[in-house]
Amino acid sequence: MDRLVFSYCPSSKVTARFLVKFCFIEYQDSQEPCICTIQLFSGNESGSLMQKCFVSKIPNKSLLPTELSKISTHEWLDFGVTVSELSLNAKFVVSAWKPSFNDEEVYEFVGCTTYRLFDENNLLRQGLQKIPLQTSKEIKKYSPTSLELEQVKEINRLDGLLLKLQLGDVPSVNWLDDISFGKIKDFRSKHMSLVTIPILYLDFLQFSFPVVFQRSYYPKSENRVYYSSFDLELNLDSPAELKHRRLVRSQRNGPLDKDLKPNSKIRKELESILSYPPSEELSLEEKDLIWKFRFYLTRNKKAMTKFLKSVVWTDSSEVNQALSLLDSWTEIDIDDALELLSPSFVHPKVRAYAVSRLETASNEELLLYLLQLVQALRYDNPISSDERFQPSPLALFLVNRAISSPSIGNDLYWYLVVEIEDEPVSKLFSSVMFLFQKELSKSVEGRLIRETLSAQAKFVEKLLRISKSVQSFRGTRLKKIEYLKVLLEDHKYHLLDFHALPLPLDPSVNIVGIIPDACTVFKSTMQPLRLLFKCQDGSKYPIIFKNGDDLRQDQLVIQILTLMDKLLKKEKLDLHLKPYRILATGPTHGAVQFVPSKTLATILAEYHGSVLAYLRENNPDDGLNSANYGIDPVAMDNYVRSCAGYCVITYLLGVGDRHLDNLLITKDGHFFHADFGYILGRDPKLFSPAMKLSKEMVEGMGGYNSPFYQQFKSYCYTTFTALRKSSNLILNLFSLMVDANIPDIKFDKEKVVYKVKERFCLQMSESDAIKYFEQLINDSVSALFPQIIDRMHNLAQYMRS
């Protein structure tokens, strides 16, 4: 069967300009010239407005459409677009006006219409187009008869056939065309006089082929160039608000503000603002309110940090007023002083005031915050490579305290050693270290401390060399253990016996030698060493020395845990946590206090899945009370309390990757966590609960219905509510750590404080917070997926061994 061939041209290929020409307007009883306007709309774009004036009445209504286009003398109108640029919904908007019969300067509306350039078949209209116009309301009242409609319909049909003939769509037969044209002229002459609707004749360009609409597709650019534009005013304050603030805070209001006292409503607003956590941003209205009542607030020590946040530090007059109020303000607590050392407060006098408040802290209290205070040195006065170091008040304070306290001096030294390895701030911390060494050399006691620190550095270097040698030694674990003992006995390391040396991990302990036979190598990827040291008092001190692990994150967790333990004891709540010690001696090595214990996985394997059996064997109850499950009440109390403490604290810190191999229990029942490689909500496992509380841990308390489990939950609620009271201190400590080179803090440092704050549930009342934590416990115990993960982990450990 022969294929039908249809010749056409796609509109996207037609680059000719789209042109149109006015011909005539036919309407009844009118000889006046008409003014017509025509506008092209293509897509969402409108073209320029074209306006033409011409005589509307044609001399002979019997003329055919093909003859009308020939007698038109108007020029072609160019809309500045090509046919290829026309959209499918492109249309004309046409309106016609004629002079008024009474006043030639006034024009009357004749008609208007919209006319699509592509028909219902997506073909571009060509040749002469006959377009009826919509008339005014008066004309619309006329309703043509059915006979008139039939006549108009017939005329349109004949005109359409003539247009097809003109376009070549119908073959031409000369003798038949002459007869047909005569009949059509007679019909038009007879019936056109009855048509009352204005009709516009427009002449479109004609092409050799039908033009079918087709979208234009642009080729993909190989050389793409992206441009970014920046709004320079995007983050700027509104000038009107700035002007208002200057007027509100004008110095002329100063004398009046001194006598201002808030009413009960404003007092509640101020109390609400002062209760905000440190990370909460104050609105402009809240800042203005704090500033307005600044003199009244000087008697409230909790208001200073909020007041300093409300100061516009670019306004010298405000700065002078704010600084003058510092000395008259009620002395603030240490936790608020820590907030003033955060990156949010950069003015030297504000930071100096914070340091003056730290001077009231005891050495024991200062040790709890020392890690963060070292990090706060970053925000004092950063120095460039060509700038001379000027010690800040904080640096001088830390150095002076370190000279007077060996414990602070020990920790400060090792914190600085680690930070010096961090390239961006190496010069700053090297300068502080130089200042520390320089001040030590000024006194006999100081020189002794300096010699001790130097001996500690050499001691750690020996352990590092031994650890690297063991790691590079080829052989089984047993061979590595034998090789370790040989190295420890080697006289070149001088580790068997030496002069008393404060252990860097715990400077309160003086070690005098090592016991090689009690040392071993753990079966782990990094092959950490377990070393046992002889102490000056005859005791022994076991440690784990790790090379290849960054212990700074673990060090932070244990430091916060130790602080929380102190805070709970102040609230008369002793959870028997006994946190162990961790010290990073470098970016990739450090020491951990070894606590004799067994992992939960080992206990379950050796005691047939029973924590109770493990506790009973190591702590048998001599009494006949069956309520203790045959376990010494002290051991059971240790277990219940420490479980509660670690569950709450690890939840608050978002400790992840919890499994049965990093949950441990000592013989006397102390429960604790190890390996803090994931914190702040990060976890390599899917669907991990917010808190690790396995059913094995609960069964160690006697099960869900035992009184010990109820006691455990009570300890959890009390611990959670007690730590919520100290949330500002914890949040301030984390705000000082946001730029520390710690993996899970660097991961998303902008949200570090927010993640910790979120877990305190500070937006809840105390009763709601307890209900929330109760639900958290229930969800953790009943979670199925962690149990599956624990089983898979145990299987993986078995296969690995």
From Swiss-Prot:
Region (Activation loop): 673-694
Keyword Magnesium: no
Region forming the signal peptide: none
MF terms (GO), sorted A to Z: 1-phosphatidylinositol-3-kinase activity; ATP binding
Ranges for region G-loop: 521-527
Domain of life: Eukaryota
Keywords: ATP-binding, Autophagy, Kinase, Nucleotide-binding, Transferase
Keyword Zinc: no
Pfam name, any one: PI3K_C2
Function, as annotated: Phosphatidylinositol 3-kinase that functions as a part of the autophagy-specific VPS34 PI3-kinase complex I that plays a role in autophagosome assembly. This complex is essential to recruit the atg8-phosphatidylinositol conjugate and the atg12-atg5 conjugate to the pre-autophagosomal structure. Also functions as part of the VPS34 PI3-kinase complex II.
Record protein name field: Phosphatidylinositol 3-kinase pik3
